[in-house]
């Protein structure tokens, strides 16, 4: 069974989301996603300042097995990317939940209602 921290929210597309004290959301891919993909060799992340809509493809994760889109879990503005992880994409394999990809500020009126909790995500990947 994959590691599914209870304090995070998730998407059905295998992204994890942590709400920060300032209200921004930190986004990464789940342990299940990295395990399924295998050794990650390349990450393409969104540009800071980009306005995105929930469900938009905002980046790409490439492994030795496959390439997969990274989706925005909510509508908002990309406010930061983890540029260090672009240089060491394999760190996602080592610790998916410490290896965040980008931070997003919710758009006015946007919500996190469609995100799922750890229990629901655990059932999804069982």
Swiss-Prot record:
Keywords: Lipoyl
Domain of life: Bacteria
Chain positions found as N6-lipoyllysine: 65
GO annotation (BP), single: glycine decarboxylation via glycine cleavage system
GO cellular component: cytosol; glycine cleavage complex
Disulfides per UniProt: none
Pfam families recorded: GCV_H
Cofactor note: Binds 1 lipoyl cofactor covalently.
Gene3D superfamilies: 2.40.50.100
Domain annotation Lipoyl-binding: ranges: 24-105
InterPro entries with a match to the protein in the record: 2-oxoA_DH_lipoyl-BS, Biotin_lipoyl, GCV_H, GCV_H/Fam206, GCV_H_sub, Single_hybrid_motif
Cofactor(s) the record lists: (R)-lipoate
Family statement: Belongs to the GcvH family.
Subunit structure: The glycine cleavage system is composed of four proteins: P, T, L and H.
Biological role: The glycine cleavage system catalyzes the degradation of glycine. The H protein shuttles the methylamine group of glycine from the P protein to the T protein.
Family annotation (PANTHER family): GLYCINE CLEAVAGE SYSTEM H PROTEIN, GLYCINE CLEAVAGE SYSTEM H PROTEIN-RELATED
NCBIfam families: gcvH, PRK01202.1
Record-given protein name: Glycine cleavage system H protein
Gene source species: Burkholderia multivorans (strain ATCC 17616 / 249)
């Amino acid at each position: 069974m994959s590691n599914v921290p209870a304090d995070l929210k998730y998407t059905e597309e295998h992204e994890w989301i942590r709400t920060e004290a300032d209200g921004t959301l930190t986004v990464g891919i789940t342990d299940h996603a990295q395990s399924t993909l295998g050794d990650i060799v390349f990450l393409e992340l969104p540009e800071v300042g980009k306005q995105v809509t929930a469900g938009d493809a905002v980046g790409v994760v490439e492994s030795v097995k496959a390439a997969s889109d990274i989706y925005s879990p909510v509508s908002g503005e990309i406010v930061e990317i983890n540029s260090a992880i672009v240089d060491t994409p394999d760190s996602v394999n080592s610790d998916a939940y410490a290896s965040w990809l980008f931070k997003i500020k919710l758009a006015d009126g946007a919500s996190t209602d469609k995100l799922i909790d750890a229990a629901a995500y655990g059932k999804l990947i069982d």
